[in-house]
Amino acid sequence: MPTPSLPAGFDFTDPDIYTQRLPMEEFAELRSSAPIWWNEQVPGNGGGFHDGGFWAITKLEDVKEVSRRSDIFSSYENGVIPRFNNDIAREDIEVQRFVMLNMDAPHHTRLRKIISRGFTPRAVGRLHDELHERAQKIAKAAAAAGSGDFVEQVSCELPLQAIAGLLGVPQEDRDKLFRWSNEMTGNDDPEYADIDPKASSAELIMYAMKMAEEKAKNPGDDIVTQLIEADIEGEKLTDDEFGFFVVMLAVAGNETTRNSITQGMMAFADHPDQWELFKKERPETAADEIVRWATPVTCFQRTALEDYELSGVQIKKGQRVIMFYRSANFDEEVFEDPYKFNILRDPNPHVGFGGTGAHYCIGANLAKMTINLIFNAVADNMPDLKPISAPERLRSGWLNGIKHWQVDYTGQCPVAH
């Protein structure tokens, strides 16, 4: 297999790369020459890990295999987030094991079973009318403003309302939920340099635990009550478990859906033919293509619990493997014309919600409903939207985030190039 021609010292989790761009050419280079590639990291520059590097997994089938083999590849050992500040203490990585994303069976299996009660088609469907109404209000308010930051005025709002609605968070507390989720994920970005993500996480956990206490006293017909009350098998979430579940929702639900919405709109701005098609037909397939194109989580990692051969490459026990969803979603062997944004793409076996297996996104249906509703509302209320300036990217080696994007909702301003 040929050696990939990458610059010396190139690191696919380097947050400085993602401030400017997505390394799509480098991903394509790996897929063609070394789909499973050892990414060496110099001591002190491993984003909190001190093990010499990781295996970069770039093709869709390999990503799916790692996802499926949760008996071999652990989420618990080093957590799933592959990049922190270089000086993070090991105990600050290990504390994240309380969040379901970073668990293995049997703890993960038990929690997932309880939490899935809140994400049944019926539970998600109950939010539809409220979210439809909110989506229309959000788009109308943005249209009335004339221009502004699409991220803050449009993208942020509906995913936040979806999560808050699911949990029954009062309207007056919802902005706090948004602030905490931003602060927990922006720790590598200079905009959040003076924020302590641990403090934000602790505040959110305390808030969630109080909510659980309140619901225990005054149960209702809502997800919180369902999760903290025992089922027929006696299973329920403890207050601590519920607190960490809300942390996961605030990050995995709010942040990822928001970034899919922003980058979906950016894609429509770059592909006006697809926007015209969406406005006319509103195809159900659009949400999946938006998620594939955006791939809001660039990558997650696992750690090998034993030696394992993956597509002819020997992975050693204890080595980290990083699944680059961003690369897998543009795999030429899986997707016809992958660099074409095509809202009618069907089938669309993307891994924007994670690979198959135990950790597949539990809220995928809620995310897709939210995306469909907000784009319908944008098409109804500001069909001629145009960018004013280039988007401002989040500095992160794992989350594909957009912090700000100035747009003209009326389509009257000259377009930025």
Language model features with spans:
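Cytochrome P450
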Residues: 1-417
